[in-house]
Amino acid sequence: MPWIQLKLNTTGNQAESLGDALIESGAVSVTFQDTHDNPVFEPLPGETRLWGDTDVIGLYDAETDMAEVIAMLEYHPQLGKGFIHKIEQLEDKDWEREWMDNFHPMRFGERLWICPSWRDVPDPTAVNVMLDPGLAFGTGTHPTTALCLQWLDGLNLAGKTVIDFGCGSGILAIAALKLGAAHAIGIDIDPQAIQASRDNAQRNGVSERLELYLAKDQPADLSADVVVANILAGPLRELAPLISVLPVAGGHLGLSGVLATQAAGVAQAYEDKFTLDPVAEKEEWCRITGIKK
């Protein structure tokens, strides 16, 4: 169905208040967007971190009387009469279908392809992971996921056990299994990620070789030949004591979700227990890998 979009510009510390006002005026959803397209990384738990110059965007049903909405919002103390705004009619689209149409098979390394479950595989002889991301992060389109997939493709995983710490959609654990790993373990804090990983494992015929745990339930004695963690720099630093004990001696560690500018700080948290490789970069992101001493 078609929608009406109302966009306001404000400062970060006023954005949530204006978002509440849009909901009260009849918006069915509100989103926040940086006016200058700068990313915000690693909000603290429970924190909604916003930009200094923020667009507040409300989505309204096409039948909404926007003159009435504007009149109502003029009483808001941060706005007032004649406040600056932009109203736009959004065309009627099947947004889910549009997203699906833009998600294409992607190749990583020499052998590995990640293919949307609704598309044909381009090379039936390759190692193909059929993926439906669902609500969990991890499609291969993000540079950090790509860096991890390329790294896994370059390892000899035959007969190995792999831990995917922060498994999201399960893409890394499933790719490892399809690349020859005997067993994989996926860990995440989000139940939706566990479900998405389980569904994707079934789709790829590897369910019997994949264990999945919420982080609070993971066994204390887990270990693996290969450990990959594609999360964020802050958690990688904070969880270094936990992650560092997971690889066996001589095992491989791969870390991503890290901006290139954060690489040194993350590497420092692991350098005592690992012989680290040169950092690999893709766009503004990087991957840190090493061997357990």
Swiss-Prot record:
It catalyses: L-lysyl-[protein] + 3 S-adenosyl-L-methionine = N(6),N(6),N(6)-trimethyl-L-lysyl-[protein] + 3 S-adenosyl-L-homocysteine + 3 H(+). It is an enzyme of class 2 (transferase). Its EC number is 2.1.1.-. S-adenosyl-L-methionine binds at T145, G166, D188, N230. GO terms for cellular component: cytosol. The keyword Methyltransferase applies. One of its GO terms (molecular function) is protein-lysine N-methyltransferase activity. Keywords: Cytoplasm, Methyltransferase, S-adenosyl-L-methionine, Transferase. Gene3D superfamilies: Vaccinia Virus protein VP39 (3.40.50.150). GO terms for biological process: methylation. It comes from the Bacteria. It is found in: Cytoplasm. Methylates ribosomal protein L11. Belongs to the methyltransferase superfamily. PrmA family. HAMAP family: Methyltr_PrmA. PANTHER family: ELECTRON TRANSFER FLAVOPROTEIN BETA SUBUNIT LYSINE METHYLTRANSFERASE. This is Ribosomal protein L11 methyltransferase. It comes from Yersinia enterocolitica serotype O:8 / biotype 1B (strain NCTC 13174 / 8081). The gene is prmA.
